[in-house]
Design a protein with these regions (language model features):
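Short glycine/serine- and small hydrophobic-enriched flexible loop segments
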Residues: 113, 140-144, 209-219
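Bacterial N-terminal signal peptides that target proteins for export
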Residues: 1-3
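Short, well-structured active-site flanking segments
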Residues: 143-154, 222
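Conserved, well-structured interaction surfaces
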Residues: 37, 41-55, 75-146, 161-198
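An aromatic- and glycine-enriched ligand-binding surface/loop that stacks and positions planar moieties
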Residues: 17-79, 149, 200-204, 212-326
Length: 326
């Protein structure tokens, strides 16, 4: 009898332990995710909408689109005293919110910490390249807006008060890290993706971002030298002495990497017969598909029901979902 009870108790405890260690049913577990190419693609696809600049062409406070209700502009009641003007939201740290402020950065660093779950090295490194590109883009945007910024290349735990309260890093150090991330992206990204080559970051996109970021920082330091924005024009980080000249040289070298790889659309190269002297200019606005030879990183804007990412406004306007009565 005692033996039977001992056996039953062992079985019961074993079953309870197995139940308690089950993976979460309503949330992603890093141990079971980030294992396949589709997992990595799904996670990194969010970076495009979170970090790239928003270029929606319709505006509910203009004449080209209306929301579900008449707004203050359309009613003629929007005035300075009514305080109905849109202002950017500010989080508790005083940073203007942009899709959750540091949330996109956390998602990038979280991805880089767990992408090693994918055993296919070629796939893993390709999507790591996407993450490095967008971390560089994220910090490039933040430095443009705020100057000095705290640099994080890891996920901050809720109890890590030291990291949460760390002071800002000098903009020169952060921009140096931006260029390093561009180099990491360039090493890992393909020349072009098999599917949607125009709309995925590539080697050319990484070098274009590096050239843009380095040119911005180099000219900023050149024309603000000696001001509180640039206390000293030469700084040394990780053994590198940086200055306005250093950033400008980095911009030149990055630009040289992609020069000659793209060509401007000259017309009549996609099976479309020119109908006028300025046909190429006309086709720039009427072609359904862009010429890939002149595009480094683009977006597709089509009124196609199958296309919903970043094209919802066009979809809504085509189908009459955006109007004064709908």
């Amino acid at each position: 009898c005692y033996i039977l009870m001992a056996v039953l108790s062992a079985v019961m405890f074993a079953s309870c332990e197995g139940f308690l260690t089950k993976p979460p049913q309503t949330a992603l577990s890093p141990d079971s995710f980030f294992r396949s190419a589709s997992d990595l693609e799904l996670w990194t696809n969010k970076f495009y909408s979170d970090i790239l600049e928003d270029t929606d062409i319709a505006e509910t406070y203009a004449d080209d689109m209306m929301g579900s209700s008449i707004n203050t502009v359309q009613k003629g009641t929007r005035t300075a005293s009514s305080k109905s003007w849109s202002t950017p939201s500010v989080d508790g740290n005083g940073y203007i919110s942009s899709n959750g402020t540091f949330t996109p950065l956390m998602n990038i660093n979280y991805f880089l910490e767990h992408s090693s779950n994918c055993q296919d090295e070629a796939v893993r490194e390709r999507y790591n390249g996407v993450a490095y590109f967008f971390r560089a883009y994220f910090y490039y945007k933040m430095v443009r807006q705020y100057g000095d910024m705290p640099w994080y290349d890891y996920v901050i735990g809720s109890a890590d008060t030291e990291s949460l309260n760390k002071p800002r890093d000098p903009r020169g150090y952060v921009m140096m890290k931006v260029l390093e991330d561009c180099d990491k992206a360039y090493e890992r990204l393909p020349e072009a993706w098999a599917a949607g080559p125009l709309f995925h970051v590539s080697k050319n996109a990484a070098m274009a971002l590096k050239a843009r970021a380095a040119l911005f920082e180099g000219t900023f330091r050149k024309y603000h030298s000696g001001t509180p924005f640039v206390p000293q024009d030469q700084e040394t980080y990780d053994g590198k002495t940086i200055s306005s000249q250093w950033f400008l040289e980095q911009a030149v070298e990055a630009a040289k990497t992609i020069m000659g790889k793209k060509s401007l659309y000259a017309g009549n190269t996609m099976g479309i017969a020119p109908i006028a002297k300025n046909a190429s200019y006309r086709e720039f606005f009427v072609l359904e598909d862009a010429d890939p030879n002149e595009t480094i990183l683009g977006r597709a804007y089509k009124s196609d029901e199958a296309v919903t990412v970043r094209h919802g406004i066009q979809f809504d306007m085509k189908n009459g979902k955006r109007s004064a009565t709908q």
